[in-house]
């Protein structure tokens, strides 16, 4: 049952993240949806790690630029799986 809940929550988070919701929204969802336990701690850690990794970066060309314009009003660059604001790639 808990495994099904975890999978359902993660799929829901992936679906909602495509709508532009940020990590803090998912943390709040986990806080209210999952009772306080080891499972909640694991889910919060997973949400934080996934929130730090921007999977859209290599797949969607303008993701980093949109992300950095939203946060810092700078040009964004994709560095592997993570966006860097105002730091161009140095090859």
UniProtKB/Swiss-Prot annotation:
Keywords: Disulfide bond, Ion channel impairing toxin, Neurotoxin, Potassium channel impairing toxin, Secreted, Signal, Toxin. Its main location: secreted. Disulfide bonds join 57-78, 64-83, 68-85. Coiled coil: none annotated. The keyword Signal applies. One of its GO terms (molecular function) is toxin activity. Expressed by the venom gland. InterPro entries: Long_scorpion_toxin_alpha/beta (IPR029237). Residues 21-27 form a propeptide. GO terms for cellular component: extracellular region. Residues 54-91 form the BetaSPN-type CS-alpha/beta domain. It is found in: Secreted. Residues 1-20 form the signal peptide. The keyword Secreted applies. Inhibits voltage-gated potassium channel. Belongs to the long chain scorpion toxin family. Class 1 subfamily. This is Potassium channel toxin BuTXK-beta.
